[in-house]
Amino acid sequence: MRLFCPIYPIIASAHRSGNVAGARGNLKSARKSAAVFRGLQRKVVNRQYVFASAALSARDEPQQRESGGIRIERVGSYSRPAGPTHWSVLLAMRYGLQGNHREDFKMTKTNDILSNESLGFDPDVLAQRYAEEREKRIRPDAETQFVQLSHDSPFANKYLEEDPYSETLERAPLKDQREVIVIGGGWVGMLTAARLSQAGIHDVRIVESGSDFGGTWYWNRYPGAQCDIESYSYLPLLEETGYVPKLRYSYASEIYEHAQRIGKHFDLYKDAVFQTWVTELRWLEDESMWLVTTNRGDTMRARHICLGTGPANRPRLPGIPGVEQFKGHSFHTCRWDYDYTGGGPTGGLAGLADKTVAIIGTGATAVQCVPALGESAKQLYVFQRTPSSVDVRNNAETDPLWAESLEPGWQRDRQKKFGEAFLGGPIDPAFVDDGWTRLTRNLKQLVAQSEEKISGLAQIADFKTMETIRGLVDETVKDPEVAEKLKAYYNQFCKRPTFNDFYLDTFNRENVALVDVSETQGVEAITETGIIANGQEYPVDCIIYASGFEITSSYERRLGIPIFGVDEKSIYEHWEAGMRSMHGLMVSGFPNLFLCGGGFVFQLGANYAHGIDVQAGHVAYTISELSRRGIQSANVSLDAEERWIADQLETKGGGFVLGGSPDTCTPGYYNQEGTAKRYRNVRRETYSKGVGAYMKLLRAWRNDGQLDGLELK
């Protein structure tokens, strides 16, 4: 991002030295080495420094007015470009400082606000535009607009059971016993098994539906697929496996290879079973064991069960009339058909050279694969209901000298700093400086004012950020009409932000057409030969569904496993009034059962892998401690569940909310397709204090050593 949102009038962060000139408003050519250090805060905190979009200003008596309950200041300016660096330039110039200090400082001022003139837009006009864009996309069928795939549907079977990357593996049914069975072989399951191994628990079996480890990264092999979190923080267990990613943002092939690396390093392949779906879990009270049955005829027993299926394990399809009638070729992006398209994850889709292709969906997946489709297809139609916000990626190869200089503990430290920075904490560019942290930098620590005032300031900052991103569309896309349709008119975090250096430019190609379907709330129908949108039929040879996963459907549906606990009670019956647990991990009436990563998404942050590692370590500690004490059964008390719910209620709303309310966002999986009000239940929401606070909470529980809240036998 070339410009950052103008939140610096509230908190300025100066961290670089630079060349400055002159004194007061008359800049001269004399060069100085500028520096700003913490002691300067005492001198400037009571002065009026205002950040504007194109210039910096310093006035002792700013002119003020009121607008919409927010104080506005009109100021003059130095004729010098603005930006984070120039705070240090301005202040060093002001006080004649010299030197090479590089320490950060924060300057808090409660009444320095931007004017509409300096903003370059009218917040009221933008707010109205956002509301209009939301309303025209709201559908009464909400989440039911998507096809619910089931194993009984021949049409859906290829998205649930067929594996385009491997032949079926035959094996005899298993009837053995394990200390721990982990269900799921993606990051959640692998991290849980790895942390169990480190805790001395080696009798562990992973049951995975795919043909290898990797989970999402086994299935998602579409061209251009890559992580959107810095790989040094996202790829788990880097230090443990002695690996440093080749790129700052790894592509899917490298991530899948790392999953295999983890499996080999921790010897997880030895007892794992692949191409296997668990069909039921049943607690055997007289044995204090779980009975696990599968589609392969297995009847395994386990002392402990770890559910690690993750949130993106079930693809979804749009419920477009006629979707099953199409006579051409079709597939979901998570089951990419390279036999049809040719090429591979890096592109070169030669099989599409004479094909007219349609892709439905413009979320994070489409942003990554559309460039390769545009390069290869004879004609590409991109059907878009809501555009993604697309910022620059700026990927780069890993510096080998940097990789060699890393000290023990580097990844945990980096993950910790990313989590803090994402939630508005201090940022050290030497560790974390990417698109995510640029979007959220300093938003939490705005001003020591009321929550209402902070919300207003955050909204202005969000407007400015999105104006910058919309400006990038204008700079990149040559056709003004197409550019306007590609602009995202909603708050930054209404949808998962995307970062890509090739997506927008793809719409400059003559063989690529954007089909906006916002006015009709989506594609109208699919025929035997094509797609009907806006009353027009588009004949196509192939339809690619970039429609994502059932992220927010019920846990019962996403998991797809009947679970029966004490007295043969179903866990879904226990959750009839909403999901409930202790720590988001254990459920009363279901002894020795751990929900890892999928049931309760506790962290308000972007790096999911870090969050599940926190849970995996805690689960490993709990199981190893139970084993050490000779405990056969550990059941959460109802009181412990109620205390956790009470804690959730107490902290609800206390976390840092990025962007706008789900009630004001355009429809998407973040707000249950625009119906967030209906589904609000504190038992389903994030742990609003964030992953850092969650880590401290679990650490305190472990340090107490009492296994508080567990009924032990």
Predicted features along the sequence, with ranges:
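N-terminal FAD-binding dinucleotide-binding subdomain shared by FAD-dependent oxidases/monooxygenases
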Residues: 37, 62, 96, 108-180, ...
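Short hydrophobic alpha-helical segments enriched in small aliphatic residues
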Residues: 12, 16, 20, 30, ...
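Glycine-rich Rossmann-fold phosphate-binding loop(s) that bind the pyrophosphate
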Residues: 184-190, 362-363
